[in-house]
A protein has these predicted regions:
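Conserved C-terminal "switch" segment of AAA+ ATPases
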Residues: 20, 24, 41, 177, ...
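Walker A/P-loop
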Residues: 57-93
């Protein structure tokens, strides 16, 4: 049973929609149109596209883990184009400084300082190979993700909204890298694993990318509409049993606590924190709306649970020695 949405109308919603129900229907239609447009260029990555769009409408950020050459840059560029948002890509290297990301003050001819914005000043930022840069530079990016603003020379500069960061990591080459600590990983809503395309998908990719024609995507939404839909997601009502399921799921991952499962205590060194519970509910709200429902159920929580918990659970030596993955542990908990 799905609860009806309230008739509350926000300032942004009142531009186009008479009620939240009408706005919810428009979001579902826009989502399917986005999937169609993105599918013209991005082939065989349907689950990745679903999760990235869910994060955008949930005001979350994504960590994308995959080997080079799987079209991570093309994916986020295509999504930015279809959403009519500005896009910047930052290649993280060991010598990258915080000022290279957030910007710096320069001396003008009038002998005063002028702030020159860095690449972080875009709606969508691709932080490529974030684990290749020192912690000081990582922290500058992660602060902007949390605060939606940067501070340079004591002055605070707000970032343009909507603001979304997609950071990538290469799981193979770990030499000379600076792994993100758990506290920093917790800033990301989703950890998405990007796998190789299927044989059929790769056939289509090769045909599409080796010809002289290049498909283009239509702009489906603009910034004001995206912000309106982000506020709509937050207003979706949730039944108590769904909230209880999400919080209970997170508590099951905390080894040695009253509500932890025996399996979690046996295999995990560390469990998920309260931010995971928050992301589960917001992600479930968004997943419900994108699929034409007006309130989430437990299945919507399950639909976003793995990418939310994947980077928040730390396996112990026993789990690593036995080759038990975080994915296996999460699926057992579900």
């Amino acid at each position: 049973m799905h609860l009806p949405l309230t008739s509350h109308v926000s300032v942004l919603m009142s531009i186009q929609f008479s009620s939240d129900k009408e706005a919810a229907d428009a979001l579902a239609r826009s989502y399917h149109a986005l999937r169609q447009e993105i599918g013209k260029i991005i082939i065989g990555q349907d689950e990745v596209v679903r999760l990235v769009l869910t994060a955008v409408f949930s005001q979350g950020h994504c960590l994308l883990v995959g080997v080079p050459g799987l079209a991570k840059t093309l994916l986020i560029q295509t999504i930015a184009d279809s959403l009519d948002l500005s896009f910047n890509r930052v290649q993280f290297t060991p010598d990258l400084m915080p000022s290279d990301i957030v910007g710096s003050e320069t001396l003008t001819q009038q002998r005063d300082f002028q702030f020159v914005p860095g690449p972080i000043f875009a709606n969508i930022v691709l932080a490529d190979e974030i684990n290749r840069t020192p912690p000081k530079t990582q922290a500058a990016l992660l602060e902007s993700m949390q605060e939606y603003a940067v501070t340079v020379a004591g002055k605070r500069y707000p970032l343009e909204r909507p603001f979304f960061v997609l950071a990538t990591q290469n799981p193979i080459e770990q030499e000379g890298t600076y792994p993100l600590p758990e506290a920093q990983l917790d800033r990301f809503m989703f950890n998405i694993e990007l796998g190789y395309p299927s044989y059929e998908a790769e056939l289509q990719i090769v045909k599409n990318t080796t010809s002289d024609t290049k498909p283009t995507v239509s702009k489906i939404l603009h910034a004001a509409e995206i912000q309106a839909f982000q506020h709509l997601v937050r207003r979706v009502p949730v039944a108590d049993n769904v909230v209880e399921y999400a919080v209970s799921l997170v508590h099951k991952t905390r080894p040695g606590t009253d509500r932890a499962t025996a399996r979690a205590t046996q295999l995990l060194e560390w469990g998920a924190g309260p931010r995971a519970s928050q992301h589960l509910i917001v992600g479930a709200k968004c997943n419900a709306l994108l699929n034409g429902k007006y309130s989430p159920d437990i299945e919507d929580v399950k639909a976003v649970a793995l990418p939310i918990l994947r980077h928040r659970l730390v396996r112990n030596f026993k789990a690593e020695a036995e080759g038990i993955t975080v994915e296996q542990i999460v699926k057992e908990l579900l």
